[in-house]
């Protein structure tokens, strides 16, 4: 099987590529524009494989996408290419509209034109797997808002969409496009919506890598608001396994939620990281003393939580890592891979961090 993976140099995309090359006999064509968060060093361990090919291309480029489909003849698409950082979407939403909505449309059309020319057997087995986020659902009631002993709801595959940020609105739009191409044209699509990912090779603008690296450098550990926002945390390698399971075994037209069963307040995540660093690389004062509280971001959702029963029941997938085991692996990886970290921390990244966090008081 040959799988075309868009965004394969990104955080989740590179985990998917590594999983396929290291754990299956399938081939990968990695299509990536290599924007600031795309890093081919994340694929150094698999880039020499005969089953791996790289195409430096933008999913918004219709000519390039048509050529890539015609040249590589994939059996499936795993579409991960996206602008994905909520804070960046607030200060610069245009890139999110262009990549996440227009790019998905261009890719769908290239896939549809390619798929329509396949023989019946290949048409039936072809899959266009669109990887999305739980943020399209909006937010859920927080424990602070619940009555005593009241069970808190979870996001299911039938939860209504209510995106809060330009990022989540752009992903919701792309989800709707993918489902429309199934219903209108018959393209065999699948959508997955996942919770917050963490793990190795994560670009250091997101909470967990930002906290690890700032802590080690003696910098402030910025916490939005009171830090009581709740997220469900999913180890990225567990997510990669889930995505491969869906593209190879999932039913066309279906949606699958993917979660880690690890609801944590942001402040508790940060405290856990500080305690691990106190254990592994202790210093005179606890890393907890570097925690600082900054103004919350606009429209910040208070709670996300995934019901992943469907993928477990129908496809047999379950996460292997607990949050405790996964966060320890993550901290240890960043401590052991300082060269990777230094190479991704460009001047552009530094100026963005200063603008986004140091201006919040």
UniProtKB/Swiss-Prot annotation:
GO terms for molecular function: dTDP-glucose 4,6-dehydratase activity. It holds the Pfam family GDP_Man_Dehyd. The keyword S-adenosyl-L-methionine does not apply. Its EC number is 4.2.1.46. Coiled coil: none annotated. GO terms for biological process: dTDP-rhamnose biosynthetic process; lipopolysaccharide biosynthetic process; O antigen biosynthetic process; polysaccharide biosynthetic process. This is dTDP-glucose 4,6-dehydratase. It comes from Shigella flexneri.
């Amino acid at each position: 099987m040959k799988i075309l993976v868009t965004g394969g140099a990104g955080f989740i995309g590179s985990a998917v590529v590594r999983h396929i090359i290291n754990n299956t006999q399938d081939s990968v064509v990695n299509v990536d524009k290599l924007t600031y968060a795309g890093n081919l060093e994340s694929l150094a361990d698999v880039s020499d494989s005969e089953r791996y090919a790289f195409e430096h291309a933008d999913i918004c480029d219709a000519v390039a996408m048509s050529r890539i489909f015609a040249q590589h003849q994939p059996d499936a698409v795993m579409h991960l290419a996206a602008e994905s950082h909520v804070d960046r979407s607030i200060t610069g939403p245009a890139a999110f509209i262009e990549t996440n909505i227009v790019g998905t449309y261009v890719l769908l059309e290239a896939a549809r034109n390619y798929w329509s020319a396949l023989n019946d057997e290949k048409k039936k087995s072809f899959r266009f797997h669109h990887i999305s986020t739980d943020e399209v659902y909006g937010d859920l009631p927080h424990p602070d808002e619940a009555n005593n002993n009241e069970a808190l709801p979870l996001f299911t595959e039938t939860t209504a969409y209510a995106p809060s940020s330009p990022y989540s609105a752009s992903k919701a739009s792309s989800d709707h496009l993918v489902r429309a191409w199934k219903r209108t044209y018959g393209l065999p699509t699948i959508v997955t919506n996942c919770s917050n990912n963490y793990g190795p090779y994560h670009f250091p603008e997101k909470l967990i890598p930002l906290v690890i690296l700032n802590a080690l450098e003696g910098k402030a550990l910025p916490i939005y608001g009171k830090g009581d926002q709740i997220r469900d945390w999913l180890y990225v390698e567990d997510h990669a396994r889930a995505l491969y399971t869906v593209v190879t075994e999932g039913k066309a037209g279906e949606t699958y939620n993917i979660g880690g069963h690890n609801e944590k307040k942001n402040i508790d995540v940060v405290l856990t990281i500080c305690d691990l660093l106190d254990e592994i690389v202790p210093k005179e004062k606890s890393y907890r003393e570097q925690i600082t509280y900054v103004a919350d971001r606009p429209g910040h959702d208070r709670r996300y939580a995934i019901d992943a029963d469907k993928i477990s029941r129908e496809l047999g997938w379950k996460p292997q890592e607990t949050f405790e085991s996964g966060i320890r692996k993550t901290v240890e990886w960043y401590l052991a891979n300082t060269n990777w970290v230094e190479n991704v921390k460009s001047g552009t990244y530094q100026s963005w961090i200063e603008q986004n966090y140091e201006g919040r008081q």
